[in-house]
Amino acid sequence: MWGGRAGALLRVWGLWPAGVLGRRPLSCNAASLAGSNPSGCWNCGSPGGPVRGDGFFCPQCRALQPPDLTRDYFSLMDCNRSFRVDTAKLQQRYQQLQRLVHPDFFSQRSQTEKDFSEKHSTLVNDAYKTLLAPLSRGLYLLKLRGVEIPEGTDYEMDRQFLMEIMEMNEKLAEAQSEAAMKEIESVVRVKQKELTDNVSRAFERDDFEKAKEILTKMRYFSNVEEKIKLKKIPV
């Protein structure tokens, strides 16, 4: 199959898309900070149940509680589970959470709380980065729906698309000036914008197979973007 041969060439060139790990815009509100502590507070033994306020601290002794690993990134960052995200509000939420759980604020607390703080901060960072970029957001949203894109396959990409990627790679390999690389960057940026709009519509229709196809293409172009960045770094 031609696609298989093209895939082999893409692997040789290092252009195989690497894995990446994010409707209505998100809304940030105080209610989203509520959580639960079903097993009770580790510090004072306060019984579990609904936790008022920020949801990260025991309402009785105010000890930082362990992260809720069952909570998905959209819930943590107070977003609707949607591809459409208000990135300004997402950033506000990120800053809000880091002001609550960043390790710098726990230097004088118990070792247990220091450890929990590290875990909370890492989780918030991962959630923010994932939902900020359209590609990783889309892949994560698919994963929540039980749909994943296998690594190391061309996912039945059509011949025309694979030819486009290979030609772009050839141009990048031949590019000897910053202007030439900027031209390729511009083309990729336009392609990614178009694909982002298309995948947004696919998610709105709950057409996850179409979203999967589009995100695979976005992953190819993202790989090209990384190659451009590497080529710009002085040796």
Where do the PLM segments sit?
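C-terminal accessory/regulatory regions appended to core domains
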Residues: 2-235
